Structures are given as structure tokens and as C-alpha cells.
Amino acid sequence: MDRGPQDRPGLLRTWGPLAAVLAALAAVAVLVLAGDGTGTGSAGGATATTALPPGEGLPEEVLPFSVAEERGVADEIDWGPTCDPTTGVLRLPLSPAPQCFAPFTGDNGGASATGVTGDAIRVVVYLPQRNDPILSFIYRQIGNTDTPDKVFATYQGFNEILDRYYETYGRTVELVPYEATGNISDPVAAAADAETIARDLQPFAVVGGPLLTEAFSDTLAANRVLCISCGPGQPTSWYEERAPYVWDIAKNPQQNLMLVAEYVVKRLGGRPAVYGGEGVRGRERRLGYVYLSSTPQTEQLRRGFEAQLEEGGVELAETASYEDPVAIAARAGEIMARFRDAGITTVLYTGDPLAPQALTRAATEQGFFPEWVITGSSLVDTTIFGRTYDEQQWRRAFGPSNLFARVSPEVAGSGYLYRWWHGEPPPAQQSALILPNLQLLYAVLQGAGTELSPEQFRRTIFAADIVRGSVIAP
């Protein structure tokens, strides 16, 4: 594989391994436009089993390597130095490797949407408020020293790499920083920030956003501005109502809870607790549920989760919600006492990675040692946060996870890619969601062609084949 222009064997700094672990949050779906261009659905009366000509539905100027092979023209194309023509994938140390697209020549038609000219695609990078009290509290738990400046510099570094390798049809992605005016849970500031971005910066897209309020993504959608990873996860219907503007990287909470419900029904319900402590182990499981209520849709998600459990013959004996991951310490004792008195053997948890600190400490103080079911909530299943929970409690934790097998950051991952190209670690060592956000953006730009718009962005995603993952790249 070709090496970057400043290849040196420098090591990642102290928290480099975290970047590789946190990349699991992304669960990046690598988009490869190929085949019939309609996914597994139907179009124009054709069924999913109807054989269509190779590349049917693709814009004329968009030619993936696999389609060129099917058409028998791959050998006639000069794929350029960034493509490995023996495999049809880009010469990038990414897994799975992105497919090559034929180099574009000619006129791209100029402006095609707000923020899109003949030369550039304007993309705003949302940066958190400096010294955001909530983020500062979270960062202190894991020694994170990232600043907005470091985060934006890392975005720029990855953007340089992807701009070199992906086909964007004569346009360059232009990143514009925007620093938030409020903390990540402030809906008023979030809505005002979104209005300012839409009115004054007029971008094609925004990447990033406040993760504890939907006001930012909701306001951007109302202003017809596309955004990626710009707010907390929502039910599927929420995204559909705001289509084609709001996109996320990971599966949404509704999809995650469906997975958790299936796991609980098939593996836990009606069976004895085997990982609990004294007074719990051996008893038939009695479930309690603790969850973060951060959006108006949270209760809708909870009701759907309970309904799916009940369909499988499993009931939640107790539930408890919280809204503030920092203030949960004041309620943790009451929640755990209620669960203990209700005879709960098994605690299901969906929320932020901080609350289990207070919950597990409170449980131990009360001599209550239930099972803890990991549900794939962001970062809760990572070692770096797990080490901050009460050890006597977390030794009893198990359940489904979104994480993949660990790989040394010296041989793979976002930090490795950055170092491979720039010869030094990324400025923001712990901002592993940066690369997936840009990967999604560039993958869609490459498949969308010259007529770029939010609607074409959506069509491109839904026309893409699903690329199977692996134990190191789910």
C-alpha cells in the first residue's frame, strides 16, 4: 500500500487507543454505489430479483469500479494514482477499503444547491462551546484535553486526506468552523446557532452538533440544511419527518432498543440471575430499567421498548428516568433503594457514560448487587469509562455491545490513517467521530455526482449497497 507523504513511525499519544475504541460508536456504513442502483427495493416496476443493466440509476458521470468491470470497460479507464486497479479500491489504509470511482472530467454544471458552487462545497463544522460545563465534567473523567481548535484542526487534517482520494466532480469540500454559544443541552442556544448558520454561513451541510438537545438538528432541517451527527439519536419516524436533511452514523435508539429487547426476551426473561451477588443470584430475573430522558421522543421509545418486551412475555418491574447526567448523583441513592426494595435482580441501562458512576456507587453503599445489562449505549461498554464505575458492581455487567475487536492504533484506525498521511498524531486524539462523519459525507458526494442537493444525497444513500462488516470494522 502506498505511504503518506510524511510517513514516520511516531506513536500515538497517551489516549491514542481510546480513539480506536471510540470509533466503534460510528459503526460506519461504507457506501458503495454499485449493482442496480436501487438497493433491494423496487423501481419502475422492477422487483428486487429483476436483472437490470450494470449501473442502472446512476448519474451518467458516476462510475464505480465494480460497474465498470460489469460493463467490461474497467481496463479502458485511467483510474489515477489513488486507485489500485488490481482490486478496484482506493489505496487507503481503511477497512473495508472504499471503492474507486472513475475520475471526472468536464463541466460539473456549477451551483446545484445552497452552499454548492462549481468549485466548492461549503460544510460547517460544529464545535462545542469552550469550557462547556457538561462536556468539561465528562472530559475530566477520562483526561480529555481536546479543545475546539484541536477538533477543527483534526477535521481539516482528515479532510485533506479524503479530498485527495475521493471523487468530488471538480469541487473541493470547504470546512468552516462554528463555535457553539451554549452548552450541549441548551435548546435555546442550539436553535439560535442553527439559525445563524443557515442564515449567515449558508452551507450545504453541517457536521456535528449538541448531543443533548434536538433543537439544533430540528432547526437546521426547518431551514433545509443537511446535517450529519448533529443531535441525539431519535426514533425512525423523526428522521423520516425531517428527510432528507438529518443523518446519523450509528443506529438510532429505536433500532438499538429493538436489538436489546430481542436479547432480553431470548436470553434473560424467565431465567435465573446468574451474575448477581448475594440475595440476587439464583432468583428468577426481575427487571428494572434506568434510562436517559433527553428528548420529547424518549417516552415514545420507552413505550415501544416495553411493548416489544411484553410481546415476548417479559415485563419491566420498575423504571426510572433522569435528564441530567451531571445531577444524577443526587437521585442515584433513591433509584437504587427503590430497585432493591422492589426485588430487582437485573438492571437494564440506556443512557450516557457518566450516570453508572453514581448508580453503581449507590448500589454498593446499600449492599445491593444486581446484574447490570449493557445495552450498547454510547461509551458505557468501553474500558475507559468502565474503570470509573464501582468495581464490585461492574464485574456483574454483561450484554450486547456495538464495539468491535480491539486493534492496535499503530496498525489501524482513524489515528493510524492520520499519522500515515501527516506523519504525526491527530491534534484531537479522542475525537474518533470526526473521521466517520467525513467518510459518510465523502462517500455520498462520490456517488451523488454533479447534481448535488439534499434530495440527491438521500437518493444516493438509499441506492447504495450495504457493505458487510467484520470483527474489526462492523
Where are these regions (language model features)?
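N-terminal extracellular/periplasmic Venus flytrap/periplasmic-binding protein-like
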Residues: 52-196
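Second-shell loop/turn segments in exported
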Residues: 111-112, 137-149, 177-184, 244-251, ...
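C-terminal region of N-terminal signal peptides and the immediate post-cleavage residues
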Residues: 26-52
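Extracytoplasmic ligand/sensor domains, especially the bilobed periplasmic-binding protein
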Residues: 78, 203-319, 371-399, 405-406
